[in-house]
Amino acid sequence: MGVREQLERVAAYFGFGVDDDYYEDEEEEERYAKGSYGNGGRTGEPSPAVRRLGRSERSSAFGTSLGDLFGSEGPERGRYAHNPPHLRAVPDQRPTRVSVVEPSSFNDAQALADRFKRQQPVILNLQNVNSDLSRRMVDFCAGLTYALDGHIQTVANRVFLLTPRDVEVSAEERKMLAERAFFNQL
């Protein structure tokens, strides 16, 4: 038996490929007509020792079906279907400190991303940075906030606030951070 035949048998077992059950009746009729069934002199009856199992018979022969494996018929799977467990989120009560980053090169982007990944809001001050680095940092931060479901807001001219998912910065805090970033340039 070749590799192709083995792959076809495996595919047929799992329900892929051509459904041979459809053609089986025609083949059996041809075999009976030709008398090529070797059934020990009996006519009209196939040999009981060898027969092909259909899909439903195959699943019952092995004690399971694909519906049992992947469906919701099992008792464990249906346990929470009607009464899901009661879970409640506990808010994090720790005060979150906002960090200010004033990059001098694009290498500072990694430190910014590490802080952001730790769910820490970041102020990005690009007021003293050349336009090429500023553009690269804004593009990086836009991708970072998108990938981690965060938000990016303009706080002042060339000053941005990056807030992680599920973190809020109050309006007063934003205003204070913008003033702090503005006075840092003096």
UniProtKB/Swiss-Prot annotation:
Protein localization: Cytoplasm
GO CC annotation: cytoplasm
Chief localisation class: cytoplasm
InterPro entries: Cell_div_SepF, Cell_div_SepF/SepF-rel, SepF-like_sf
Region (Disordered), start-end ranges: 24-91
Presence of the UniProt keyword Cytoplasm in the record: yes
Record keyword Disulfide bond present: no
Any Pfam family the entry gives: SepF
Keyword annotations: Cell cycle, Cell division, Cytoplasm, Septation
GO process annotations (BP): division septum assembly; FtsZ-dependent cytokinesis
Binding partners and assembly: Homodimer. Interacts with FtsZ.
Family membership: Belongs to the SepF family.
General function of this protein: Cell division protein that is part of the divisome complex and is recruited early to the Z-ring. Probably stimulates Z-ring formation, perhaps through the cross-linking of FtsZ protofilaments. Its function overlaps with FtsA.
Protein name: Cell division protein SepF
Organism expressing this protein natively: Rubrobacter xylanophilus (strain DSM 9941 / JCM 11954 / NBRC 16129 / PRD-1)
High-level lineage: Bacteria, Bacillati, Actinomycetota, Rubrobacteria, Rubrobacterales
